């Protein structure tokens, strides 16, 4: 029950950014272009290791990703088992992979491209702010402040985060 509410809250946040943020066309067009780039360059992107250590992205991202999943690997199987009662193993595997991938892509496309639009088109220099020693969380708030009723978006995000954690840890 709470998992279903989480899904609605998550999509409400995405729709808030997509339709109320004023960058709908940019988000959709850039999203399709990025999916095309992913399909076109998938092999190269998935095997990129930065052997000359020119930028360290591959190594830093791997460390971050592994640390992230080490934190969640304990709770995730219980959560998936809790929401998968009565389903076949095939449905659980494909559902977890498919819906997880779709949710991740949607959130990266909508939230990422909204922030990119603010950086590129509207002068919200979040990248420069972080590069000059600013806190990442403050940069996120700078982007939220460009939305109509930013306090409502933050409240919706906070409620969604609490619901997601509650659902995951309840399993």
What is each model feature region?
Residues 139, 157-158, 171:
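Short amphipathic alpha-helical segments
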Residues 1, 24, 159-169:
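Helix-loop-helix module between adjacent transmembrane segments
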């Amino acid at each position: 029950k709470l998992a279903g509410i989480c899904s609605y809250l998550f999509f409400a946040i995405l729709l808030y950014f997509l339709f109320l943020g004023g960058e709908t066309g940019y988000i959709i067009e850039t999203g399709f272009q990025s999916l095309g780039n992913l399909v076109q360059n998938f092999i190269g992107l998935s095997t990129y290791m930065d052997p000359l250590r020119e930028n360290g992205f591959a190594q830093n991202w791997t460390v971050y990703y592994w640390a992230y999943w080490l934190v969640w690997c304990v709770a995730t199987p219980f959560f998936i088992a809790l929401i998968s009662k009565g389903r076949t193993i095939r449905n659980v595997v494909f559902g977890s992979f498919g819906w997880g991938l779709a949710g991740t892509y949607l959130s990266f496309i909508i939230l990422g491209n909204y922030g990119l639009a603010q950086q590129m088109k509207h002068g919200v220099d979040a990248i420069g702010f972080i590069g000059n020693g600013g806190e990442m969380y403050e940069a996120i708030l700078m982007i939220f402040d460009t939305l109509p009723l930013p306090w409502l978006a933050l409240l919706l995000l906070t409620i969604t985060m609490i619901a997601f954690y509650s659902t995951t840890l309840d399993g």
